Amino acid sequence: LANVVGAVHAAVSAEVQDRGGAVGAFVGDGVLGVFGLPTAHDDDPERALGAARAILHRVEQINSTLGVRFGVSIAARIGINTGEAIIGNNGGDIFFDYTGLGDTVNTAARLEGINKYLDTRICISGSTHDQCPSILTREVGDVILKGKKDLVQTLEPLAENHRGAEW
């Protein structure tokens, strides 16, 4: 299992970094990808969606090779939220932990978690959808996420409008 998780971590890291993002943390088999760090781009939400699509493809490849070899399968689930976050060293003087904190990051993590209940692989928030006009989506609904008082608009990306490419 460690070999497969390691391969997934490497693939996710590469896809995030190839699109101008950074890896903020590895937590178990999960990865926090942050866009707008170290350099912000006007299209960071679209870059995150592109990375998500590529990550799903890479995980399928890993499952068909290493997964078969070791008898395991990784189910990739991705949550994307757009907004401001606190970025910096959250580890103190002894342990360096350069990552993102705050409601934006927490909401993305909660969106990742609800995929298994919604039978989706990528969930995005309304704030991400608003920044990605070229992406066709399916409205999943307004949901109450753990730790949130207000409903969060949740959507599933389906395709890019201008190309009709399938997700």
At which residue positions do the language-model features occur?
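Substrate-engagement module of ASCE P-loop NTPases
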Residues: 13-16, 54, 107-117
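Key residue(s) within conserved catalytic/signature motifs
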Residues: 32, 48, 58, 81, ...
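Cytosolic regulatory/linker segments at or just downstream of nucleotide-handling modules
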Residues: 85-87, 108, 114-167
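A short glycine-enriched loop-to-beta-strand structural element that forms part of the catalytic core
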Residues: 33-34, 72-88
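Structural signal for well-ordered, non-membrane alpha-helices
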Residues: 9, 13, 56-63, 84, ...
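Catalytic core regions of nucleotide second-messenger enzymes
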Residues: 18-27, 58-79, 116, 143, ...
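Catalytic NTP-binding/metal-coordinating core of nucleotidyl cyclase/transferase enzymes
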Residues: 1-53, 98
